[in-house]
């Protein structure tokens, strides 16, 4: 049996695999904001990124290791392919963290070996001990992943895992890379690994999975029953293609059905000890932060964090809930941090009151950031009678999107009506050369006119592929949250903004998306799975040194 920590370890990969979602690229400040919130949430491991991908990715992982990693905080992990330069870059990036981990991987399925790596099984059996040993010479905590494990030959998989553990791996990760398996198959795979790998008791078994068939969470729960003790997941289930296993769904399944799962951890069914270290009351806030910063809306019927997760439309259901919530609800909404708290903040509220409420909500802002947030609060309070927690969340989440901006919106004005052509006048500041330019454009509607004017000013080729708007709170004076997604060279970039004027919000969201596009082109990142490991700069060395 694999090493058992006595509970489930939550490995969050929102900042690495989650960021690989189309349009979900994040800047440094956004990654830091999410990392801080993940630490408050109580995750055991934060996979902060893929340091070798680009200087920007390296810097982000390094900064998270420096300011989020701590003796009492989460382990800070970086991803590295089974290559000396990848592993070295990963080590240098995570080095400031007191608790650090190198996560290295190589594919083990025949389809990946033949068509992607162009390597033989013998090649892999040589690379694994060499690269895991090299990583072990740098840090003690080593995670090794057998990419596409669920489609690998089991006997070869056992051999690779045994070699990795012998070479120093302390966690063995079993990915269902393409979301191919069913729960019974995945559970059996974990059971068979426990049974057939002689030294498996020296490592923790981890699982990683994608949601291509909608089975990722179910697969993970079955894996946990069969000995997996680390679950790799993302907030809101974001990730490549159909996404990853959802952190909030996994955690709440283990929380609500604890009496069922306890026996698989050697506990009595009525044991009150939590199965994870997650502070569940932070789930909703974390979900909203990730949604706002990535520009990826949460579907209304999403389990746990969707807008309809605790809503009841049927009269029969409403009657039952009014009499006793347990009739139709298995989770108390307050358990995941969802409440109806409406605070008495308005235009007469002072800086200290706003700071106190933000601190109660878990936000730790610097003096400069607090000043900026308070200025935005006062601006909003002049237009909105009551400021709610959701309004404050929108203010703070939008604020961290401001760094790395080549373009800043200075002024927007629109003219439209049933008998006139929608016309927009937009003034934009270029922060690189400190110039200010104005353009006028006509569109099919006010938002289209604004986007046409911005395109004329920026001259950045793009295609608008999504525009969505939703109300943050109730009331005619509510903030409107706008999400815009644009495409350039088959890559998608998201922008998000909130304002009581949805046209202004749309303008800011479009500018945010354009800024992401501009800075993404400067990063020139590589992909950990799709880019060629045989590039000379990625070449595996025969005698790796520190």
Curated annotation (Swiss-Prot):
PROSITE patterns: AIPM_HOMOCIT_SYNTH_1, AIPM_HOMOCIT_SYNTH_2, PYR_CT. The gene is leuA. This is 2-isopropylmalate synthase. Belongs to the alpha-IPM synthase/homocitrate synthase family. LeuA type 1 subfamily. GO terms for biological process: L-leucine biosynthetic process. The keyword Amino-acid biosynthesis applies. Residues 8-271 form the Pyruvate carboxyltransferase domain. It comes from the Bacteria. It catalyses: 3-methyl-2-oxobutanoate + acetyl-CoA + H2O = (2S)-2-isopropylmalate + CoA + H(+). One of its GO terms (molecular function) is acetyl-CoA C-acetyltransferase activity. SUPFAM superfamilies: 2-isopropylmalate synthase LeuA, allosteric (dimerisation) domain, Aldolase. It is found in: Cytoplasm. Pfam families: HCS_D2, HMGL-like, LeuA_dimer. Its cofactor is Mn(2+). Its EC number is 2.3.3.13. InterPro entries: 2-IPM_HCS-like (IPR050073), 2-isopropylmalate_synth_dimer (IPR013709), AIPM/Hcit_synth_CS (IPR002034), Aldolase_TIM (IPR013785), LeuA/HCS_post-cat (IPR054691), LeuA_allosteric_dom_sf (IPR036230), LeuA_bact_synth (IPR005671), PYR_CT (IPR000891). Pathway: Amino-acid biosynthesis; L-leucine biosynthesis; L-leucine from 3-methyl-2-oxobutanoate: step 1/4. Residues 408-546 are annotated as: Regulatory domain. GO terms for cellular component: cytoplasm. NCBIfam families: leuA_bact, PRK00915.1-3. Homodimer. Keywords: Amino-acid biosynthesis, Branched-chain amino acid biosynthesis, Cytoplasm, Leucine biosynthesis, Manganese, Metal-binding, Transferase. Catalyzes the condensation of the acetyl group of acetyl-CoA with 3-methyl-2-oxobutanoate (2-ketoisovalerate) to form 3-carboxy-3-hydroxy-4-methylpentanoate (2-isopropylmalate).
């Amino acid at each position: 049996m694999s090493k058992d920590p006595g509970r489930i370890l939550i490995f969050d990969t929102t900042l690495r695999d989650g960021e690989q979602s189309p349009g979900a690229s994040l800047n440094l400040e956004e990654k830091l904001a999410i990392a801080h919130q993940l630490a408050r949430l109580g995750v055991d491991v934060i996979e902060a990124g893929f340091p070798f991908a680009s200087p920007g990715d390296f810097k982000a992982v390094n900064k998270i290791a420096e300011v989020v990693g701590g003796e009492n905080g989460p382990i800070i992990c970086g991803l590295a392919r089974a290559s000396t330069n990848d592993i070295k870059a990963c080590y240098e990036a995570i080095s400031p963290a007191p608790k650090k981990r190198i996560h290295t991987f190589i594919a083990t399925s025949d389809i990946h070996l033949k068509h992607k790596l162009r390597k033989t099984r013998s090649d892999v059996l040589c690379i694994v001990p060499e690269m895991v040993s090299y990583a072990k010479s740098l840090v003690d905590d080593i995670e090794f992943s057998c990419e596409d494990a669920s489609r690998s030959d089991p006997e070869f998989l056992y051999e690779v895992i045994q070699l990795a553990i012998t070479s120093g791996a302390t966690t063995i990760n079993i990915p269902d890379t393409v979301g191919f398996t069913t729960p019974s198959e995945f559970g059996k795979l974990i059971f068979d690994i426990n049974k057939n790998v002689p030294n498996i008791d020296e490592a923790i078994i981890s699982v990683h999975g994608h949601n291509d068939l909608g089975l990722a969470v179910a697969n993970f729960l079955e894996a946990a029953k069969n000995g997996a003790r680390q679950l790799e997941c993302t907030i809101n289930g974001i990730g490549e293609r159909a996404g990853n296993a959802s952190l909030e769904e996994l955690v709440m399944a283990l929380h609500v059905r604890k009496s069922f799962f306890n026996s698989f951890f050697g506990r009595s069914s009525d044991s009150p000890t939590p199965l994870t270290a997650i502070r569940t009351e932070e789930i909703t806030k974390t979900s909203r932060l990730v949604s706002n910063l990535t520009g990826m809306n949460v579907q209304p019927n999403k389990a746990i964090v969707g807008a309809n997760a605790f809503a009841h439309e049927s009269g029969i259901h409403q009657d039952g809930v009014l009499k006793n919530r347990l009739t139709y609800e298995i989770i108390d909404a307050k358990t995941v941090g969802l409440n109806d708290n409406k605070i008495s903040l308005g235009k007469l509220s002072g800086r200290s009151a706003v700071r106190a409420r933000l601190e109660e909500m878990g936000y730790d802002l610097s003096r400069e950031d607090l000043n900026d947030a308070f200025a935005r609060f006062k601006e909003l309070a002049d237009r909105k009678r009551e400021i709610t927690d959701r309004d404050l969340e929108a203010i703070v989440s939008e604020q961290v999107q401001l760094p790395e901006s080549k373009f800043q919106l200075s002024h927007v004005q629109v003219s439209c009506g049933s008998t006139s052509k929608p016309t927009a006048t937009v003034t934009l500041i270029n922060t690189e050369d400190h110039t200010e330019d104005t353009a006028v454009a006509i569109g099919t509607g006010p938002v289209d006119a604004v986007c046409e004017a911005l395109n004329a000013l920026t001259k950045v080729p793009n295609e608008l592929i999504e525009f969505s708007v939703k109300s943050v709170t109730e009331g005619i004076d509510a903030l409107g949250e706008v999400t815009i997604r644009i495409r350039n060279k088959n890559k998608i970039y998201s922008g998000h903004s909130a304002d009581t004027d949805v046209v202004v919000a749309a303008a800011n969201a479009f500018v945010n998306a354009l800024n992401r596009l501009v800075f993404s082109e400067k990063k020139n990142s590589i992909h950990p799975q799709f880019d060629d490991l045989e590039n000379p700069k990625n070449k595996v060395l025969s005698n790796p040194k520190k």
